[in-house]
């Protein structure tokens, strides 16, 4: 984090990223002294409500963060910033997004946790848009012009006032990661599906919390000891939910999906929800995962936008690739059969052991749907594209693709999943069958 005093003294000349959070109420004019170098401007955590009309003087600016401020409208001047690709106004009081506030090169727009009740039709002009974060607003519908954003891959519309998912949305050629829980049309399904797969609450007096194992946007995971009457203590993990809206959606929907998902070899077992208690955070008690499991990749970066970032030394064998692919397809098919869309099918949500055995985690973007509805096949095929992206990444980190017939077949399955004609993609029942054939043929060849 930088200081305004450093900026005024000229100590920051030549920097490419500026982070200022000092309760600012006006835009410091000294920022323009950085015009020839500044590419990332982070003014989050201030009290700003406007930006200067000459903001385009920052002619190299690519990324602008103004979250946790006092804006009630997205400043129109942003639309005149020729190089701006990423714009973030999370957690303001924004009620209006003017059509002329959309930069021509926009790839990533974050308006989570505001008061928007409509999007401008001009959103359809954002032909480079890949990532649109709108959870926690008041949207009642999506403009049909959004269908013109043919590169859109990730959409977060949870916790709004939407009455339905428009059919055109599910036909978008690259849409792969969708979260829509917490809307009137999905709340009913959430309640119905959860009622079909209940887990009794666990007495909190039986659980003692120990050290923190990790934390994310929705909560904190503790190591825990579960002491049931008449049984030996059992080492577990407990996730305590903060209760706040995240960029993906609402924590109560994550809890509901984690419970409704039920048991599966490739899911982290959930013992049950912690019993409600005054003043206590809601929580889930889960199995403690063997430390041999590691996250497969890191989340997308500012530059990669929608694609995960793998360690530079990541190398996968053919056997690992096939096992990961098979495990993931099996668990997603299981979720879809229960009316759950994972919504965040990414390598950074996969825990993998050295043999390739895989656990799918993080239901923060999960949504509920009627698995017998007319829209169900389209939702399943939407997530098939996310699976195709995962296959593409797995194959890219395997050196033996060209020499292994099974991996060549897997590459063909990847192409089918990435088909831009959404109706022509396989669903996960078809994907799992294809993988069974691929693995069986590989075993026969090895024998």
Each model region followed by its residue ranges:
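Catalytic-loop of the protein kinase fold
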Residues: 332, 336-352
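Structural motif at the C-terminus of the N-lobe alphaC helix and the adjacent alphaC-beta4 loop
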Residues: 256-265
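Short beta-strand micro-motifs within the conserved protein kinase catalytic domain, predominantly
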Residues: 269-282
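Conserved short submotifs of the Hanks-type protein kinase catalytic core
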Residues: 279-294
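ATP-binding glycine-rich loop module of kinase domains
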Residues: 220-257
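C-lobe/activation-segment region of protein kinase-like
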Residues: 364-416
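The feature captures the LRR N-terminal capping module
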Residues: 1-53, 57-112, 118-121, 131, ...
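Activation segment signature within eukaryotic-like protein kinase domains
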Residues: 324-325
């Amino acid at each position: 984090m930088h200081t305004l005093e450093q900026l005024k003294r000229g100590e920051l000349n030549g920097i490419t990223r500026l982070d200022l959070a000092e309760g600012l109420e006006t835009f410091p004019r000294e920022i323009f002294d950085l015009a020839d170098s500044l590419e990332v401007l982070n003014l989050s955590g201030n009290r700003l409500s406007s930006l200067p009309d000459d903001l385009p003087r920052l002619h190299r600016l690519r990324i602008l963060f103004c979250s946790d401020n006092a804006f009630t409208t997205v400043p129109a001047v942003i639309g005149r910033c020729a190089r701006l690709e990423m714009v973030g106004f999370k957690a303001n009081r924004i009620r209006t997004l003017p059509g002329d506030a959309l930069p021509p090169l926009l790839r990533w727009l974050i308006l989570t946790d505001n008061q928007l009740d409509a999007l401008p039709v001009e959103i359809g002009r954002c032909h480079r848009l890949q990532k649109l974060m709108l959870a926690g607003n008041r949207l009642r519908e999506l403009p049909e012009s959004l269908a013109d954003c043919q590169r859109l891959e990730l959409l977060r519309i949870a916790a709004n006032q939407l009455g339905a998912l428009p059919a055109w949305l599910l036909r978008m050629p690259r849409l792969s990661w969708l979260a829509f829980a917490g809307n009137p049309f999905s709340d009913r399904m959430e309640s119905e599906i959860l009622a079909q797969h209940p887990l009794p609450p666990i007495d909190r007096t039986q659980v003692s919390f120990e050290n923190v194992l990790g934390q994310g946007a929705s909560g904190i995971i503790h190591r825990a000891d579960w002491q049931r009457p008449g049984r030996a203590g059992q080492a577990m993990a407990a996730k305590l939910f903060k209760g706040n809206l995240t960029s993906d959606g609402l924590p109560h929907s994550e809890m509901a999906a984690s419970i409704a998902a039920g048991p599966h070899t490739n899911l982290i077992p959930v013992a049950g929800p912690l019993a409600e208690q005054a003043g206590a955070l809601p929580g889930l008690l889960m199995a403690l995962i063997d430390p041999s499991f590691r996250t497969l990749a890191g989340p997308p970066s500012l530059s990669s936008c929608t694609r995960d970032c793998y360690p530079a030394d990541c190398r996968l064998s053919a056997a690992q690739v096939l096992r990961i692919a098979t495990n993931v397809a099996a668990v997603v098919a299981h979720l879809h059969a229960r009316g759950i869309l994972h919504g965040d099918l990414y390598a950074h949500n996969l825990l993998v052991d050295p043999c390739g055995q895989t656990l799918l985690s993080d239901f923060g973007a999960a949504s509920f749907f009627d698995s017998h509805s007319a829209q169900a096949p389209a939702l399943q095929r939407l997530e098939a594209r996310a699976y195709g992206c995962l296959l593409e990444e797995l194959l890219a980190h395997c050196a033996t693709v060209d020499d292994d017939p099974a991996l060549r077949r897997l590459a063909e399955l990847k192409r089918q999943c990435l088909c831009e004609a959404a109706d022509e993609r396989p669903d996960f029942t078809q994907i799992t069958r294809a993988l069974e054939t691929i693995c069986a043929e590989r075993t026969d060849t090895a024998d």
